Amino acid sequence: MKYKRIVFKVGTSSLTNEDGSLSRSKVKDITQQLAMLHEAGHELILVSSGAIAAGFGALGFKKRPTKIADKQASAAVGQGLLLEEYTTNLLLRQIVSAQILLTQDDFVDKRRYKNAHQALSVLLNRGAIPIINENDSVVIDELKVGDNDTLSAQVAAMVQADLLVFLTDVDGLYTGNPNSDPRAKRLERIETINREIIDMAGGAGSSNGTGGMLTKIKAATIATESGVPVYICSSLKSDSMIEAAEETEDGSYFVAQEKGLRTQKQWLAFYAQSQGSIWVDKGAAEALSQYGKSLLLSGIVEAEGVFSYGDIVTVFDKESGKSLGKGRVQFGASALEDMLRSQKAKGVLIYRDDWISITPEIQLLFTEF
C-alpha cells in the first residue's frame, strides 16, 4: 500500500446542491468511499467544509448568507448537523468518527499544536476517522478564502500523511481557466511550486465555496515542503476518492520534497510568530543559508524588537535586506544589546537545530497576490 495515511479535503461545492444547501446524497457517497478505504487498511482524516451549508436553512435563510455573523450562526447550527450525517453513515459500517474543530491558534501555540498532534495520533491508531473543520462559529479571519484548504495541508503535515487529496469541482491545475479558455491544459505532474505555478492558479478554480485554486496551491506548498505529496482532482465521479488513493483518477499531482520538514521545523517555518528582527553580516548570512551553521554573536550587526530567551526572531541579511529565516534565540533583547555593545560578543544566538531557512517556495506563502 503506497498511501497508508491519507488526508482528504472536501470543499463546499462537493457537498452541496445547486441552491447551496447540503446534499445528503453527496455526503453519503463520500462516507461510503471512506468506509471502503478504511476497510482496505488506510488511515484516514477528512477535512470537511459544509457547516454553513448544512445550517443556514435551519435558521430560516433562503440562501447562503454573506455577513460574518450570519455565517457564524449558520456554522454553529450546521456543524452538528453535518457531523451527524457523517457519523450516521459511517456507523452503518461499524466505523467510529471523531469531530475536531481547529483554529489557527492551535497551530501557532506550540503546546496546543503538540496536543492536537497527540489526539489525532491516538484516533488514527485506534481506527477512528477524524472529521476536521475550522471552528467557523468563533473565528473571524479564518472565514476568509482558503481556510480549510490551508487547514487540510497543516493537518497533513502535522500527522506526516502519505498523501493529501483535494476534492473539488475542477479536475486539477490548468494553464488557464478551463471554463473560459479552450486552450487551457491540465498539468498532470508539478515538481516545484514556483511563481509561474502560482500565476496559473490565479485564473482557475471554483466560485461556490470559500476556497479557490490559488489557495489550494499555496496549501500544497505547506504539504509538499513537509514531505506530503498532494493530489487535486474532481469530486464528480462516484469513486473519485478511491481512484485518488490508487492513483487512477485524473488530476494534478504535486511532488513532495524528498527531505520534508519534520514537526519542529514545520512549526518554525509556518506558524511561529516572530518577536524581533536580527540583521547579520555577509559571513553570517552565508554560514546560515549555505553551510548549515549556527548563528554566532560575532556575525550580528544589529537587533530590533522586544524578545526574551526562547522567543522566535526573523534574521535578515544586512547587505541585501533579504529574509534568511527564523530561529529560537538563546538570549533576550536586553542581554543581546549589552553583548553587542561590548564589541567582544562570543557565543551562539541561534543553534542550527532551532533554525529554519526560508526557501523561495516557503516565501511564496507569505506573498500577497
UniProtKB/Swiss-Prot annotation:
InterPro entries in UniProt: AceGlu_kinase-like_sf, Asp/Glu/Uridylate_kinase, G5K_ProB, Glu/AcGlu_kinase, Glu_5kinase, Glu_5kinase/COase_Synthase, Glutamate_5-kinase_CS, PUA
Residues that, per the record, bind substrate: 49, 136, 148
GO cellular component terms, A-Z: cytosol
Domain PUA: 275-355
Residues where ATP binds: 9, 168-169, 210-216
Example GO biological process: L-proline biosynthetic process
Source superkingdom: Bacteria
Key words, A-Z: Amino-acid biosynthesis, ATP-binding, Cytoplasm, Kinase, Nucleotide-binding, Proline biosynthesis, Transferase
Pathway: Amino-acid biosynthesis; L-proline biosynthesis; L-glutamate 5-semialdehyde from L-glutamate: step 1/2
Localization in the cell: Cytoplasm
GO function term, MF aspect, one: glutamate 5-kinase activity
UniProt catalytic activity: L-glutamate + ATP = L-glutamyl 5-phosphate + ADP
Pfam short name (any one): AA_kinase
Family classification: Belongs to the glutamate 5-kinase family.
Function field: Catalyzes the transfer of a phosphate group to glutamate to form L-glutamate 5-phosphate.
Protein name: Glutamate 5-kinase
Species per Swiss-Prot/TrEMBL record: Streptococcus pneumoniae serotype 4 (strain ATCC BAA-334 / TIGR4)
Lineage: Bacteria, Bacillati, Bacillota, Bacilli, Lactobacillales
